Amino acid sequence: MKDIFYMKKAIKLAKKGSLTTSPNPNVGCIIVNNNIIVGSGWHKKTGMKHAEIYALKTSGEKAKGATAYITLEPCSHFGKTPPCCVALTKYGISRVVIATLDPNPKVSGNGVKWLKKHGILVTIGTLSKESIKINKGFFQRMTTGIPWIKLKLASSIDGRTALNNGKSKWITSDKARHDVQHVREKSDAIISSSETILFDNPLLTVRNTNNNDNNQKLLKHSKTFLKQPIRVIIDSKNRITPSHKCIKQPGLLFLIRIHSDNNIWPSHIKQIILNNKSKKIDLIDLVKMLAKYQINNILIEAGPSLSSSFLKLNIINELIIYIAPKILGNYAKPLFFLENYSNLSDVPQFKFEKITQIGKDLKLILTKHNSS
């Protein structure tokens, strides 16, 4: 019971870095000596000290003979920071409780081996599911080579996204649209389509988040400014031009194309060519490519065509649906364009994770049955 109690505190600490640690995972560490917390820390940002180092420095000499509760296996290799295993030994930690092993197959288990080799008792698996949950994207990218993929949608209660003439501003309330900004800021990349850019001309940036109390706490803990997600526009027909709003906004933007054009693009715009025999953008190739850029979490914001294409590939891990108390009717545009299924067993299936009322609207979060 003590291990669970202290690991919960370590996981709570880890969450403080949720807006700033990517591509690294969120990690927290609590150091306990004689049932007293003598040190604590969390990983704040890539390139900065790991959680264990902050906790050890705050504990000082009191770390000798203590137990360290860490939400992820401590590193044993030299990277941007020295290995945490060495520091744990140097400070005299006698026992380490680890929520879960590092999912990176190249290093998984190495930290545990190092600790045991140097005489430290190790316990593994305390609140493992909870630790994985706060790092879903990192774990998925490391184990499958594909980031965690979220699809954001907004609809009426009859599942319609726009009137037949295309008008959709605004189906949901200001509060719901404000909440979308918080969904964006927790994403490493936003995928959209040229169709969406041509029709709505959106910015696809994070904005208007400063009024959120929880966000302010996270920013205070991180001591840094939020970075914008990488914007990824699928533009197989080269229809996006330097005049579109999203292009004029600062922050890295990928134009995913079959071939490049001769436009003069700003330095933050990168044309990425994904060509194949079908002359279409392969969405699996796209998300695998984004994983190589160390992107853990992808948010899709697009119309029914692209949303349906991703859904058919069965790679959507999470649905985020904002539902407005409006009825648009059967002539309005649907959420998806899907085939005419003959059997219910063939349809895409998700499970409800959370339902929240935001202003006049509902926010539904659903995950696949096989998603963590």
UniProtKB/Swiss-Prot annotation:
Binds 1 zinc ion. Residues 1-145 are annotated as: Deaminase. Its EC number is 3.5.4.26, 1.1.1.193. Gene3D superfamilies: Cytidine Deaminase, domain 2, Dihydrofolate Reductase, subunit A. One of its GO terms (biological process) is riboflavin biosynthetic process. In the N-terminal section; belongs to the cytidine and deoxycytidylate deaminase family. In the C-terminal section; belongs to the HTP reductase family. This is Riboflavin biosynthesis protein RibD. It comes from Buchnera aphidicola subsp. Baizongia pistaciae (strain Bp). The lineage of its organism: Bacteria, Pseudomonadati, Pseudomonadota, Gammaproteobacteria, Enterobacterales. The gene is ribD.
